[in-house]
From Swiss-Prot:
GO terms for biological process: alpha-amino acid biosynthetic process; arginine catabolic process to glutamate; arginine catabolic process to succinate; ornithine catabolic process. This is Succinylornithine transaminase. Its cofactor is pyridoxal 5'-phosphate. Catalyzes the transamination of N(2)-succinylornithine and alpha-ketoglutarate into N(2)-succinylglutamate semialdehyde and glutamate. Can also act as an acetylornithine aminotransferase. It comes from Shigella sonnei (strain Ss046).
Length: 406
């Protein structure tokens, strides 16, 4: 008989780079999870915007099981049918002509930044290597991507960092303009800063970045790892803005919970990446590709995308009602089903405590820094699940406020 697993085992056996919740989920269905003790949770965290179709979706399970019964892996010396079908679906649905597959958002952003450097070096010379990113951004945990992220708390312990990366203020085109010049090879930006507090870019800001990149022959990279695959009510957030990037990174929801990432780009940009310039062992494996192909098929429909916009209204209306009652938030913001509740000054820095109270009440939420409670539920979350989950969240808010005033 195997040894029972407890939360304490994490503290004994794992490298302590995470501080997970005190309970261990063991089963999920739709937007509900159950822990080892059988307690039910409504999941509004969605695996950090990953589980776009909830837990154990029957059609995703079928796609995975069907491919699992055929073969799992061959390596990049061979291609496979699921990855080619997935590539064609992404190309048909977006601006892209070419796709590179990997396993995560960090890998996709790493590939995008490497491509941008090589494109500039090949076309203009090695002097054109500057990357402009934004403060409070998040692009992954590799040394290159964490340096681009603009959050010193994540990068300061790993110096020396890659050079030629500078950070402008987000949503401030004048700040960006002061840094972007003819030595800039790329600008990387999130259409909505997720980890940075669920801050949507303005239309003028993204349009201004496009114009600056065109003027200085720099590539514009949209990091859509968190905003992509229906999260905002469009398949990709760039479609809201009417601004087309040169490169787009996608991951998280693309696999619906199965690890997969991708870099989308144009024929012109892709042409500099020749055999051997980049690669990954597992990228585009048939298991991930089969699942991601089914995810795209289910999400990229008018019914699903319009449903995201409807669900946004459900959440915002209820969250504003909760806020009217308890006065916790200064703002409820976001697009689609990426929503942030910004704590007012009286509760600054206490988002984590609210998320912990929520879990005790049976609802899972996220934070985005110390001042924002973040919601990133499944795109197909039902109205009943929204109602039940937000009732539990309201109870958590009541307990949090009463505890603070007692």
């Amino acid at each position: 008989m195997s040894q029972p697993i407890t939360r304490e085992n994490f503290d004994e056996w794992m490298i302590p780079v995470y501080a997970p919740a005190p309970f261990i989920p063991v089963r999920g269905e739709g937007s509900r999870l159950w822990d080892q003790q059988g307690k039910e949770y409504i999941d509004f965290a969605g695996g950090i915007a990953v589980n776009a179709l909830g837990h154990a979706h029957p059609e995703l399970r079928e796609a995975l099981n069907e491919q699992a019964s055929k073969f799992w892996h061959t390596g990049n010396g061979y291609t496979n049918e699921p990855v080619l079908r997935l590539a064609k679906k992404l190309i048909d649905a977006t601006f892209a002509d070419r796709v590179f597959f990997c396993n995560s958002g960090a890998e996709a952003n790493e590939a995008a930044l490497k491509l941008a450097r090589k494109f500039a070096h090949d076309r203009y010379g090695s002097h054109k290597s500057g990357i402009v990113a934004f403060k409070n951004a998040f692009h992954g945990r590799t040394l290159f991507t964490v340096s681009a992220g603009g959050q010193p708390a994540y990068s300061q312990d790993f110096a020396p960092l890659p050079p030629d990366i500078r950070h402008a203020a987000y949503n401030d085109i004048n700040s960006a303009s002061a840094l972007i010049d003819d030595a800039t090879c790329a600008v990387i930006v999130e259409p909505i800063q997720g980890e940075g507090g669920v801050v949507p870019a303005s239309n003028a800001f993204l349009q201004g970045l496009r114009e600056l990149c065109d003027r200085h022959n720099a590539l514009l990279i949209f990091d859509e790892v968190q905003t992509g695959v229906g999260r905002t009510g469009e398949l990709y957030a760039y479609m809201h803005y009417g601004v087309t990037p040169d490169l787009l990174t996608t991951a998280k929801a693309l696999g619906g919970g199965f690890p997969v990432g991708a870099l989308l780009t144009t024929e012109e940009c892709a042409s500099v990446m020749t055999v051997g310039t980049h690669g990954t062992t597992y990228g585009g494996n048939p298991l991930a590709s089969a699942v991601a192909g089914k995810v795209l098929e289910l999400i990229n429909t008018p019914e699903m995308l319009n449903g995201v916009k409807q669900r946004h209204d459900w959440f915002v209306e209820r969250l504003n009602t909760i806020n009217h009652r308890y006065g916790l938030f200064s703002e409820v913001r976001g697009l689609g089903l990426l929503i942030g509740c910004v704590l007012n000054a009286d509760y600054a820095g206490q988002a984590k405590q609210i998320s912990q109270e929520a879990a005790k009440a049976g609802v899972m939420v996220l934070i985005a820094g110390g001042n924002v409670v973040r919601f990133a539920p499944a795109l197909n979350v039902s109205e009943e699940e929204v109602t039940t989950g937000l009732d539990r969240f309201a109870a958590a808010c009541e307990h949090f406020v009463s505890r603070g005033s007692s």
